[in-house]
Amino acid sequence: MASKPGPLTQWPWHNLGNYKYALVAPSAAYSTYRFVTASSAAERDLLNFMVFPMLLLRLLYGQLWITVSRHQTARSKHKIVNKSLDFEQIDRERNWDDQIILTALVFYLVSATMPQAQVAPWWSTKGMVVTAVLHAGPVEFLYYWLHRALHHHWLYARYHSHHHASIVTEPITSVIHPFAEEVVYFVLLAIPILSTVATGTVSVVTANGYLVYIDFMNYLGHCNFELVPKCLFHVFPPLKYLLYTPSFHSLHHTQFRTNYSLFMPVYDYIYGTTDKSSDELYERTLQGRDEAAWRPDVVHLTHLTTPESVFHNRLGFAAVASNPLGAAASGHLLRAASAVASPLLSLFASTFRSEANRLDKLNIETWVIPRFTSHYTSKSDGYKVSRLIEKAVSDAEASGARVLTLGLLNQGYDLNRNGELYVVRKPSLKTKIVDGTSLAVAAVLNMIPQGTKDVLLLGNANKISLVLTLSLCKREIQVRMVNKELYECLKQQLQPEMQEHLVLSCSYSSKVWLVGDGVTDEEQMKAQKGSHFVPYSQFPPNKARNDCVYHCTPALLVPESFENLHVCENWLPRRVMSAWRAAGIVHALEKWDGHECGGRVTGVQKAWSAALARGFRPYDDHHHPGITHDGRGGL
C-alpha cells in the first residue's frame, strides 16, 4: 500500500484471489469458438485468438525471470543492491499477474470494438516502424514527465510510494502499482498499438511483440543484477541513450530523484536528471564484488521433498515459497505443474544455491540437492545421492565455508553414517560437518510440557533418539517403549545407572508421545484423548487425530537481525528455522572447532545456551513452559 492510499488503489478483483482468472474465461472461450468455427482463414481473428496464449506465455515468462533473478542474486557477484528482502515485500508483490489479466481484458475489448483489429495479419513492417517511432517519441517522453509528476509529494504519498516501498527490486517489482496508476500506464503504452489499429498497420507480431518488449525491459530494469555486456556500448555508443541497464534503474529506487526514464535514458540526459554515479555503478557491478566478500561461511545442505516442493523452493513461485509447504490453496495446480518440472531435475548433476542470508557478519547459504525424498529411500538411488552430497561437501570446502549442516535426509545413517563418512574419507577436511543433533534434542525437550514424569518413545532407532533418551534419563523422566527392538538397541548404549529409567511397556497411556520416523496412523489411534505428539524427526508425523496436540518438528525462531529471509523452510512458519539448520549457524558464530557428526555430539546444554545467547528463541506452535523451563526457554 502507498503511505496514504488514494482512490482506486485496490484492483477491482482484489478479493477474488486466484479466481480472478475466471474474468478472462468467457472471452477466451468465445474467441476460441470463433476461431475454430470460422468458415475461412480470412474470417479468423488472429489477434483476438492470440490473447489467451499470450497471457499464458507472459505468465511463464515472468516466472522464468523470477527464477533466473533469484538464482543470480543468491550467488552472483554482480548483484547491485545487497540489502535484505522481507516477507512484507513478497506479500505486496504477490499480485504481479494482475497487469497481465488487465492486458488480456483490454485486448479483448479492443478486438470487439475496433473492426480494424479483427483482420490483423501476422506481420506488418509499417506497423513495426510506427510502433518503434511512437514508443521512442511520445511514449517515452510522456512517461518521463508522468513519472516526475508521480514523485510530487501528493501523488507519491497516494500512489507511487507503493512501488517505491521495494528498495531491493525483483523483476516483478516493475509491475507493482496501485490500480489507478497502472491504468494511466496502460493508456500511455496503448498509444503505439491503438495507432497501428487505427491506421490499419497492426499485426499479430507487432502487437504481441510490443508486449514482450515491455515485459523484457521492465524485468531487466528491476532484476537487481547487472547483465548488460559492456561490448554493446562499445560497438554502438548511442545505445547508452536508448537502453537502460539494471544498475541505472536501481539508482532510481535508492536515490528516488534521479533516472526517471522508462527504458531510454536519453530523456534523463536531456533534462539533467541522470544520476552522476550511473556509469560508476554500472562499471563496478559489471566487474563484480570481491570474492571474499560474498563467499559463504555456513552452508545448509537440504533437498527437495515432494514434487510440489519444486515450486516451494525460493527459485519457484515467490508467493508459494513465502508460506509453509502445503499452505497454498492451489495445490492441485502445483501438482500439475510439478509433473512437468520434476523430470527436468534429473538433468542436474550437482547442487544449486537457492538462498543467501546474513547474520552477524556471517554469510549463510542454502544449497539444494535436486532429488526428492523418494530418491533417498530408494536403494537403487542411494549411491547416486551419496555422491551428490559428497560433491557438495567438497564444493563447500572449496568455497571457503567453515561449517556445512546436513538437513533432512542428507544425514541418514545408512547413507553416510550421519555425515561421518565424509570426515573419514577426507581427514583433513577444513569445513566442519554438523548434523545438529544436540540443538534438535534441546528443542524437543523444550516442547515437552513441564511436570511430565514419563514419555512414550516411538520411531526408528537413530542418533537423535539415543541422545534424546539419554537426556530424558538424566532428568529422571521415565522413557517407555512398546517396540522391543528399539528398546534393546537404546538400552545397550546407555550406562547401567541410566537404564532404570528405560521401560519396555505394552501400554500407550503416556500423555506425551515422542514420535520419530516410521510412526503409523494405527499407532496414533491408540493414544489417549489430549495426548501431545512431539516429533523428534526431520519430518512431521501425519496428523491422524483431531483430539490430540501435534507439535512442530524441532525448530527455533531466528534473531531479528537475521537478514534476507523471505521464504519458509519446508512446513515451518515464517522466520522459523529447523534446529538442524540453526545448529550450523550457532557452530560458526561460536567458532567451535569440532565436527558434530557420526557419534560426535556437541552437547545439548552447550548448544541450547549458545543458541539463546546468539538471539535464537524457542519455538513451539503450542506455547507452554518446557520440562526444564528457566523463564527464557532454557534447559
Curated annotation (Swiss-Prot):
Keywords: Endoplasmic reticulum, Lyase, Membrane, NADP, Transmembrane, Transmembrane helix. Its EC number is 4.1.99.5. Expressed in germinating seeds and shoots. GO terms for molecular function: aldehyde oxygenase (deformylating) activity; iron ion binding; oxidoreductase activity. It is a multi-pass membrane protein. GO terms for cellular component: endoplasmic reticulum membrane. Residues 139-273 form the Fatty acid hydroxylase domain. Induction: Induced by drought, cold and salt stress. It holds the Pfam family CER1-like_C. InterPro entries: CER1-like_C, Fatty_acid_hydroxylase, Sterol_Desaturase_Related. Its main location: endoplasmic reticulum. GO terms for biological process: lipid biosynthetic process; response to cold; response to salt stress; response to water deprivation. It is found in: Endoplasmic reticulum membrane. It catalyses: a long-chain fatty aldehyde + 2 NADPH + O2 + H(+) = a long-chain alkane + formate + 2 NADP(+) + H2O. The keyword Ribosomal protein does not apply. The chain crosses the membrane at residues 46-66, 100-120, 127-147, 183-203. Belongs to the sterol desaturase family. Homodimer. Aldehyde decarbonylase involved in the conversion of aldehydes to alkanes. Core component of a very-long-chain alkane synthesis complex. This is Very-long-chain aldehyde decarbonylase GL1-6. It comes from Oryza sativa subsp. japonica.
